[in-house]
UniProtKB/Swiss-Prot annotation:
Keyword match Protein biosynthesis: no
Primary site of residence: cytoplasm
Annotated ranges, domain Glutamine amidotransferase type-1: 5-206
Protein name: Imidazole glycerol phosphate synthase subunit HisH
Reaction(s) catalysed by this chain's protein: 5-[(5-phospho-1-deoxy-D-ribulos-1-ylimino)methylamino]-1-(5-phospho-beta-D-ribosyl)imidazole-4-carboxamide + L-glutamine = D-erythro-1-(imidazol-4-yl)glycerol 3-phosphate + 5-amino-1-(5-phospho-beta-D-ribosyl)imidazole-4-carboxamide + L-glutamate + H(+); L-glutamine + H2O = L-glutamate + NH4(+)
E.C. number: 4.3.2.10, 3.5.1.2
InterPro entries: Class_I_gatase-like, GATASE, Imidazole-glycPsynth_HisH
A molecular function GO annotation: glutaminase activity
Keyword Lyase included in the entry's annotation: yes
Organism in which the protein naturally occurs: Mycolicibacterium paratuberculosis (strain ATCC BAA-968 / K-10) (Mycobacterium paratuberculosis)
Gene it is expressed from: hisH
Assembly with partners or alone: Heterodimer of HisH and HisF.
Keywords for this protein: Amino-acid biosynthesis, Cytoplasm, Glutamine amidotransferase, Histidine biosynthesis, Hydrolase, Lyase
Length: 206
């Protein structure tokens, strides 16, 4: 079977090589690039992200990444956001009282977690539903690796989206599956066999 082609979008943020290796281990043919044509042509596009929301959006817009994402989603082409790469898919992020416009693929805001210990760092379970493709075949007690201080803590998007939740004091979105657009707040590339299973499930949809 021919390997699925995946572009990891290089806009100056994210664990690019870790993501590349994790995707290659589950059978994808991976290119790390900022090239719009390559990103448009690939079977799947991964949008990583670490650090500040505003800095990520600045880097993304600099390479036209917001347009690349929008065009792929409009055409029904799969996109996977990871960590801050998930957060920037929402309409806005609020950090230190500064509001930054995101890609706007989903309505709503990314805000600081309301917990005494920040960042939320370490392994945590998630609550996925029976309709999830990303978590297919995984047990309910499976843990994933998180490191973040901000998250989407409510959902204002399509009622048909498949939502997966986790908790750090209060609930937050751990993953969203919404047509061609999927995202995880945790790092699948740092989540061992569980993360590999999520990536494999995503690639099998391409």
């Amino acid at each position: 079977m021919t390997s699925k082609s995946v572009v990891v979008l290089d806009y100056g943020s994210g664990n690019l090589r870790s993501a590349q290796r994790a995707l290659e281990r589950v059978g994808a043919s991976v290119q790390v690039t900022a090239d719009a044509d390559a990103a448009a042509a690939a079977d799947g596009l991964v949008v990583p992200g670490v650090g500040a929301y505003e800095a990520c959006m600045t880097g993304l817009r600099k390479i036209g990444g917001d347009r690349i994402i929008a065009e792929r989603v409009a055409a029904g082409r799969p996109v996977l956001g990871v960590c801050v790469g998930m957060q920037i898919l929402f309409a806005r992020g609020v950090e230190f009282s500064v509001e930054t416009s995101g890609c706007g693929q989903w309505p709503g805001s990314v805000t600081r977690l309301q917990a005494p210990v920040i960042p939320h760092m370490g392994w945590n379970v998630v609550e996925s539903g029976p309709d999830s493709v990303l978590f297919r075949g995984l047990d309910a007690d499976t843990r994933f690796y998180f490191v973040h201080s901000y998250a989407a803590q409510q959902w204002e998007g399509s009622p048909e989206a498949v939502l997966t939740w986790s908790r750090h004091e209060g609930p937050f979105l751990a993953a969203v599956e919404d047509g061609p657009l999927s995202a995880t707040q945790f790092h699948p590339e740092k989540s061992g066999d569980a993360g590999a299973a999520v990536l494999r499930n995503w690639i099998e949809r391409l």
